[in-house]
């Protein structure tokens, strides 16, 4: 009987189930969106029970539509929106509050207090991260401090914490496995990425009881099995877990030191594999764990851009400039340039390399002659500019000059954006045949654990390029284009509520 690997891709706006075969091909997939909750400005939450329901729904739909029997599944891999935090009652299995999403800024005040107390350097050294509302630790603290009775329950050992991967493994296994992997643990602000353990000093800083935390395991390992009534009577190995961006790095077969990928999803995330060495950043990047496999841990440098695909969604849904995201490419190509219009898409602050949660979005250079086409093109170009800042920081920290950049995510279908990205980076951009690299990465990790694939060399051979977009501009032209934009931004008169900071080649509007 033919066997498949089932990948569960739990994202920020939807859950998906993807079937992969031995050749690393996508056989079938199913998707279900779920509700976004915005209780207050800057807050973003999800109902963890609704997420679980969406996972069950897509599993059933995917297998049914593909006419694949549950017993044909060799293993399950899970990849997830990272940092999003869930706290639930160990006995009832019910969350005590909504999952606080990675985008949410509701713990910004907690972060400010921790910074004021001087914890920043200690956190950076142990976790490779910055004190920011982006990460899980302050979200857990917020729940314990703001949900009535939560702290007492936690201290009595009655509550469990997990990122979304942990929540799904716990549910699929019927509560038998409370685990996470190295990649997800490294995004919590509570995990020492050098000792590979939950860190007591970090937990004391956040006042989070250690008893709440999951066991941390490698990214490719059998963590448990599905219980009968959650998988049609079958006990299928749950065998691979990785945060979405690390899974994409694995799915892109970026196994060699210095290889990098950029994912254009809701946000934009560039990761470079730094091998078994954790490279400390001096340019605003994050040092994170890529994956743990075969007794070894691989590290990565990461640049996190909070707004990418969501900027295109905003043009569509908020500004009503087009009905389908694919139309943005058509509009952008109707004009030869932005005609001096520049967009800073800081809708939820700015991530790498600025890490400013207070900055807000802005546009500059608008005249009476500015058209919808100029505005759309400027928004698309802004995504490429942000990626350029990340790449410069990455090369400076690693000492490695990038030769090519592998790309994935929904926005890579936009040829205008990819060509412009290649020109601005002065690096060829490679788009794979299979764009579902996040789901594929989780499938590969699970498949390796159950012997479905032999090793990473076999996986490497399955990566095939769909299109290579080579830079058309000369390096001098690209640099001139960047500097011209920054000079124009500098010349704009900002309101009294903002200030601008120009540092070398970087401009940030605060």
From Swiss-Prot:
<protein>
    <recommendedName>
        <fullName>Glycerol kinase</fullName>
        <ecNumber>2.7.1.30</ecNumber>
    </recommendedName>
</protein>
<dbReference type="Pfam" id="PF02782">
    <property type="entry name" value="FGGY_C"/>
</dbReference>
<dbReference type="GO" id="GO:0006071">
    <property type="term" value="P:glycerol metabolic process"/>
</dbReference>
<feature type="binding site">
    <location>
        <position position="266"/>
    </location>
    <ligand>
        <name>ATP</name>
    </ligand>
</feature>
<feature type="binding site">
    <location>
        <position position="83"/>
    </location>
    <ligand>
        <name>sn-glycerol 3-phosphate</name>
    </ligand>
</feature>
<feature type="binding site">
    <location>
        <position position="12"/>
    </location>
    <ligand>
        <name>ADP</name>
    </ligand>
</feature>
<dbReference type="GO" id="GO:0019563">
    <property type="term" value="P:glycerol catabolic process"/>
</dbReference>
<dbReference type="GO" id="GO:0004370">
    <property type="term" value="F:glycerol kinase activity"/>
</dbReference>
<feature type="binding site">
    <location>
        <position position="14"/>
    </location>
    <ligand>
        <name>ATP</name>
    </ligand>
</feature>
<dbReference type="InterPro" id="IPR005999">
    <property type="entry name" value="Glycerol_kin"/>
</dbReference>
<keyword id="KW-0547">Nucleotide-binding</keyword>
<feature type="binding site">
    <location>
        <position position="13"/>
    </location>
    <ligand>
        <name>ATP</name>
    </ligand>
</feature>
<comment type="function">
    <text>Key enzyme in the regulation of glycerol uptake and metabolism. Catalyzes the phosphorylation of glycerol to yield sn-glycerol 3-phosphate.</text>
</comment>
<feature type="binding site">
    <location>
        <position position="244"/>
    </location>
    <ligand>
        <name>sn-glycerol 3-phosphate</name>
    </ligand>
</feature>
<keyword id="KW-0597">Phosphoprotein</keyword>
<dbReference type="GO" id="GO:0006072">
    <property type="term" value="P:glycerol-3-phosphate metabolic process"/>
</dbReference>
<feature type="binding site">
    <location>
        <position position="12"/>
    </location>
    <ligand>
        <name>ATP</name>
    </ligand>
</feature>
<feature type="binding site">
    <location>
        <position position="82"/>
    </location>
    <ligand>
        <name>sn-glycerol 3-phosphate</name>
    </ligand>
</feature>
<feature type="binding site">
    <location>
        <position position="16"/>
    </location>
    <ligand>
        <name>ADP</name>
    </ligand>
</feature>
<feature type="binding site">
    <location>
        <position position="410"/>
    </location>
    <ligand>
        <name>ADP</name>
    </ligand>
</feature>
<dbReference type="Pfam" id="PF00370">
    <property type="entry name" value="FGGY_N"/>
</dbReference>
<feature type="binding site">
    <location>
        <position position="410"/>
    </location>
    <ligand>
        <name>ATP</name>
    </ligand>
</feature>
<feature type="binding site">
    <location>
        <position position="309"/>
    </location>
    <ligand>
        <name>ADP</name>
    </ligand>
</feature>
<feature type="binding site">
    <location>
        <position position="12"/>
    </location>
    <ligand>
        <name>sn-glycerol 3-phosphate</name>
    </ligand>
</feature>
<feature type="modified residue" description="Phosphohistidine; by HPr">
    <location>
        <position position="230"/>
    </location>
</feature>
<keyword id="KW-0808">Transferase</keyword>
<dbReference type="InterPro" id="IPR018484">
    <property type="entry name" value="FGGY_N"/>
</dbReference>
<feature type="binding site">
    <location>
        <position position="266"/>
    </location>
    <ligand>
        <name>ADP</name>
    </ligand>
</feature>
<feature type="binding site">
    <location>
        <position position="245"/>
    </location>
    <ligand>
        <name>glycerol</name>
    </ligand>
</feature>
<feature type="binding site">
    <location>
        <position position="244"/>
    </location>
    <ligand>
        <name>glycerol</name>
    </ligand>
</feature>
<feature type="binding site">
    <location>
        <position position="313"/>
    </location>
    <ligand>
        <name>ATP</name>
    </ligand>
</feature>
<keyword id="KW-0418">Kinase</keyword>
<keyword id="KW-0319">Glycerol metabolism</keyword>
<feature type="binding site">
    <location>
        <position position="414"/>
    </location>
    <ligand>
        <name>ADP</name>
    </ligand>
</feature>
<dbReference type="GO" id="GO:0005524">
    <property type="term" value="F:ATP binding"/>
</dbReference>
<dbReference type="InterPro" id="IPR043129">
    <property type="entry name" value="ATPase_NBD"/>
</dbReference>
<comment type="pathway">
    <text>Polyol metabolism; glycerol degradation via glycerol kinase pathway; sn-glycerol 3-phosphate from glycerol: step 1/1.</text>
</comment>
<feature type="binding site">
    <location>
        <position position="134"/>
    </location>
    <ligand>
        <name>glycerol</name>
    </ligand>
</feature>
<comment type="subunit">
    <text>Homotetramer and homodimer (in equilibrium).</text>
</comment>
<dbReference type="InterPro" id="IPR018485">
    <property type="entry name" value="FGGY_C"/>
</dbReference>
<feature type="binding site">
    <location>
        <position position="83"/>
    </location>
    <ligand>
        <name>glycerol</name>
    </ligand>
</feature>
<feature type="binding site">
    <location>
        <position position="309"/>
    </location>
    <ligand>
        <name>ATP</name>
    </ligand>
</feature>
């Amino acid at each position: 009987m033919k066997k498949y690997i089932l990948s569960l891709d739990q994202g920020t706006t939807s859950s998906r189930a993807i079937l992969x075969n031995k050749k690393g091909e996508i056989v079938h997939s199913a998707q279900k969106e779920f509700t976004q909750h915005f209780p207050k400005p800057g807050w973003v939450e999800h109902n963890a029970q609704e997420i679980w329901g969406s996972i069950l729904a897509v599993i059933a739909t995917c297998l049914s539509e593909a006419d694949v029997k549950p017993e044909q599944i060799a293993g399950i891999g899970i990849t997830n929106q990272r940092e999003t935090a869930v706290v639930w009652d160990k006995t009832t299995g019910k969350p005590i509050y909504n999952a606080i999403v990675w985008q949410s800024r509701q713990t910004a005040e907690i972060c400010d207090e921790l910074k004021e107390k001087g914890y920043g350097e200690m956190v950076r050294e142990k976790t490779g991260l910055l004190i920011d509302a982006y990460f899980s630790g302050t979200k857990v603290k917020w729940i314990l401090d703001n949900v009535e009775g939560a702290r007492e329950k936690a201290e009595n050992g009655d509550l469990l914490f997990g990122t979304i991967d942990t929540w799904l493994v716990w549910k699929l296994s019927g509560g038998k496995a409370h685990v996470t992997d190295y990649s997800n643990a490294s995004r919590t602000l509570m995990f020492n990425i050098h000792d590979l353990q939950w860190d007591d000093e970090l937990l004391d800083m956040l006042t989070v009881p250690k008893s709440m935390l999951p066991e941390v395991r490698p990214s490719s390992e059998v963590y448990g099995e599905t219980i009968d009534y959650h998988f049609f009577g079958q006990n299928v190995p749950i065998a691979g877990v990785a945060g979405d961006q690390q899974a994409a790095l694995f799915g892109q077969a970026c196994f060699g030191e210095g290889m990098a990928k950029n994912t254009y999803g809701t946000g934009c995330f560039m990761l470079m594999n730094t091998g078994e060495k954790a490279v400390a950043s001096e340019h605003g990047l994050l040092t994170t764990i890529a994956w743990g496999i075969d007794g070894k841990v691989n590290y990565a440098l990461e640049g996190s851009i909070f707004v990418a695909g969501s900027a295109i969604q905003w043009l569509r849904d908020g500004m009503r400039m087009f009905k389908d995201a694919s139309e943005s490419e058509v509009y952008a190509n109707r004009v030869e340039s932005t005609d001096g219009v520049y967009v800073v898409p800081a809708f939820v602050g700015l991530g790498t390399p600025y890490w400013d949660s207070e900055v807000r979005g802005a546009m500059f250079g608008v005249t009476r002659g500015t058209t919808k086409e100029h505005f759309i093109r400027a928004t698309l170009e802004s995504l490429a500019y942000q990626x350029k800042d990340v790449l410069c920081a990455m090369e400076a920290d690693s000492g490695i000059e990038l030769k090519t950049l592998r790309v994935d995510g929904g926005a890579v279908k936009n040829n205008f954006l990819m060509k412009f990205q290649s020109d601005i980076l002065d690096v060829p951009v490679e788009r794979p045949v299979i764009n579902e690299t996040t789901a594929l990465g989780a499938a590969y990790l699970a498949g390796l654990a159950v012997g479905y694939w032999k090793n990473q060399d076999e996986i490497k051979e399955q990566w095939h390029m769909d299109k290579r977009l080579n830079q058309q501009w000369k390096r001098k032209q690209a640099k001139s284009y960047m500097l011209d934009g920054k000079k124009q931004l500098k010349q704009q008169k900002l309101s009294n509520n903002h200030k601008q900071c120009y540092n070398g080649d970087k401009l940030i509007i605060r």
